[in-house]
Amino acid sequence: MGIWLNESSVDGFILLGIFSQSQTDLLLFSTVMLVFTVALCGNVLLILLIYTDPRLHTPMYFFLSQLSLMDLMLVCNIVPKMAVNFLSGRKSISFAGCGIQIGFFVSLVGSEGLLLGLMAYDRYVAISHPLHYPILMSQKVCLQIAGSSWAFGILDGIIQMVAAMSLPYCGSRYIDHFFCEVPALLKLACADTSLFDTLLFACCVFMLLLPFSIIVTSYARILGAVLRMHSAQSRKKALATCSSHLTAVSLFYGAAMFIYLRPRRYRAPSHDKVVSIFYTVLTPMLNPLIYSLRNREVMGALRKGLDRCRVGSQH
């Protein structure tokens, strides 16, 4: 328990947040809460559809259900505390609460980054090696892929949480952010953080750049396979399948790399807070919409579920 006992552990920290009490910020807060509600409902609905409809019991939808679960946990880790602080006017967070928020946040973002990379590999196998797909992406392999994403993400979260909470915070208690994010917290440390910066960069390389390189390689090969297809309809179907994943990848990795891979001298709290909204709130809302509205199987499962509910209510 020693890592929790330093100069800031008694009082904790103050989250300055992203909203003030102005009319404009009240409107922005209402918008964020609407986005949070859509993210919550969308991801829960997508998980239920994938779980209950046998037609969606395929590797791609299994990975999608894991992605939705990660997104669901991510928004629930950040937004409720932000809402309580804004509505109550109390912006404090305990030292232990800050550490727990960091642990969950880093674990979920790391897991999602790895899973998105491995989902690109799944699309590559499905398009380039369709005959071998059932063997290469068996149930055992799918469980191993999902399990490894969760395991490495959780390990990354524990490492960064322990390292961040071990630093002394004897100066300002004001975190210029709406949640405990590592780069914002490090600015308050009254010790040399160069070793931690190196550790953070190494974790980001493994959890962001490595899966991103898998995505780039997979889609380069997918593009080559698509161009070799003789049927225009097959090319269109393959590109439609991949476009949803590419949209989700662009939103997630664009925001995460902007926050974690920039040199410290180029970081500005106002920019970081706005960009963080993208992968903590906006991406979890957009993912179920991106993957469902452009997907016939998911929309078919949704219509089937609604029809079942309608018939049940009539009886």
Swiss-Prot record:
<dbReference type="GO" id="GO:0007608">
    <property type="term" value="P:sensory perception of smell"/>
</dbReference>
<keyword id="KW-1003">Cell membrane</keyword>
<dbReference type="InterPro" id="IPR017452">
    <property type="entry name" value="GPCR_Rhodpsn_7TM"/>
</dbReference>
<keyword id="KW-1133">Transmembrane helix</keyword>
<comment type="function">
    <text>Odorant receptor. Activated by (+) and (-)-limonene.</text>
</comment>
<keyword id="KW-0807">Transducer</keyword>
<keyword id="KW-0472">Membrane</keyword>
<protein>
    <recommendedName>
        <fullName>Olfactory receptor 2V1</fullName>
    </recommendedName>
</protein>
<dbReference type="InterPro" id="IPR000725">
    <property type="entry name" value="Olfact_rcpt"/>
</dbReference>
<dbReference type="GO" id="GO:0004984">
    <property type="term" value="F:olfactory receptor activity"/>
</dbReference>
<dbReference type="GO" id="GO:0004930">
    <property type="term" value="F:G protein-coupled receptor activity"/>
</dbReference>
<keyword id="KW-0812">Transmembrane</keyword>
<feature type="transmembrane region" description="Helical">
    <location>
        <begin position="59"/>
        <end position="79"/>
    </location>
</feature>
<dbReference type="GO" id="GO:0005886">
    <property type="term" value="C:plasma membrane"/>
</dbReference>
<keyword id="KW-0716">Sensory transduction</keyword>
<feature type="transmembrane region" description="Helical">
    <location>
        <begin position="100"/>
        <end position="120"/>
    </location>
</feature>
<dbReference type="GO" id="GO:0016020">
    <property type="term" value="C:membrane"/>
</dbReference>
<feature type="transmembrane region" description="Helical">
    <location>
        <begin position="145"/>
        <end position="165"/>
    </location>
</feature>
<keyword id="KW-1015">Disulfide bond</keyword>
<feature type="transmembrane region" description="Helical">
    <location>
        <begin position="239"/>
        <end position="259"/>
    </location>
</feature>
<keyword id="KW-0297">G-protein coupled receptor</keyword>
<keyword id="KW-0552">Olfaction</keyword>
<feature type="disulfide bond">
    <location>
        <begin position="98"/>
        <end position="180"/>
    </location>
</feature>
<dbReference type="InterPro" id="IPR000276">
    <property type="entry name" value="GPCR_Rhodpsn"/>
</dbReference>
<comment type="similarity">
    <text>Belongs to the G-protein coupled receptor 1 family.</text>
</comment>
<dbReference type="Pfam" id="PF13853">
    <property type="entry name" value="7tm_4"/>
</dbReference>
<feature type="transmembrane region" description="Helical">
    <location>
        <begin position="196"/>
        <end position="216"/>
    </location>
</feature>
<feature type="transmembrane region" description="Helical">
    <location>
        <begin position="31"/>
        <end position="51"/>
    </location>
</feature>
<dbReference type="GO" id="GO:0007186">
    <property type="term" value="P:G protein-coupled receptor signaling pathway"/>
</dbReference>
<keyword id="KW-0675">Receptor</keyword>
<feature type="transmembrane region" description="Helical">
    <location>
        <begin position="273"/>
        <end position="293"/>
    </location>
</feature>
